Amino acid sequence: MRLCVNKLSALALLRHVRVSGEYASAQVCGLPEPDPHPQHRWTARIIPHQLLGLSDPPSSSRPVYVAVPSKGARPLASFFKNTLYLSGLPEGSFLQLGESLAIPCPELLFVELATIMKPAALGLLGYELCGSFCRDPLNPRSGKVTHGLSPVTDVASIRSFIEETHRLTGTNAARRALLSIEDNAWSAMEATIALLLKKPVTEHGYGIRRIHLNERQDNPWELVRRGCANARVPDIVLDDCPVGFNYDGHGHLDLESVAAAAENKDELGRALASLRQKYVDDRRRDRELAAQGRIVMSVVSEDLFDHGGLDIVILEALMASERLGGPRAKDVLPDEVWAPEETRARQRLIWSLLPWEGGESLGPC
């Protein structure tokens, strides 16, 4: 079998091969013509549906998205949705994954999904492709997130790809989405906060464009020679303000390990020691960053779920920045950010982005 899947099918396959490590062996290829060989025709049973994000074999209501190089090459089974590419793509726009399946390169995939995804979901996808985390192929909304992976692209590469295309549907939406995306996100929740910071106020974000993620902050030698870390890496820093943010999720301090070890004295001691070590390192990190002139605010999941919770954290950070000699809070964010109808709309957007069933209104992610 030979098939180039695209759009949501390709996204699921890309997530699978990122987690498995198979993406490292992907090879640039041309756009192949679909071929069911050694079968004589396309049937649902020969499609590796779980690799393509489907829990059941494909059907007309659960299609496989396919890219083809000509009208005559279109597979006509009812469970396929075809995209025709005759021209307009740069060289190297497709990747071969093993013998049977190919996908669009990450840059083309991002543009394709701009035709399907809502802007906020597309923004989160951009953080995923340009970051070191990957969502679950079958359950991207609330499934397991894998961390510590290599990014498959970056913002500059996507922007360059868009500029090289000709009359490709989705480029305008993709170009707009890139304005709210940064490289090097380490987690999905960190990416959510960064997206909200950068999205324009007209799209219910905070409109803070100049931020960086996971950028090394070197400690002064006076601290290093006394045993402090060489550097610290806050999740998010604001370029124009002496503040930043760290997301501390439920797994940050592993309280569950303490509960699990409660009946075994030795295991409990080790779990408590590990928890204490993490807590102490966090406090030292905060002090060392403060010594560099940067206050880093912790963001917890409750701040995102509580109505107006993230608004409070952002306002606290800007008030601290102002007192540290940064710009006035009202010069960073316009008054309309805090209008009641705007805060309600922003909270609805935040809820739609979070990993819970209530966020499904955002559509595919």
Q: What residue spans do the PLM features occupy?
A:
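Surface segments flanking catalytic/ligand-binding clefts of nucleic-acid enzymes
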Residues: 148-365
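Short gly/ser-rich loop at a beta-strand->alpha-helix junction or flexible surface loop bordering the NTP-binding
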Residues: 1-169, 328-365
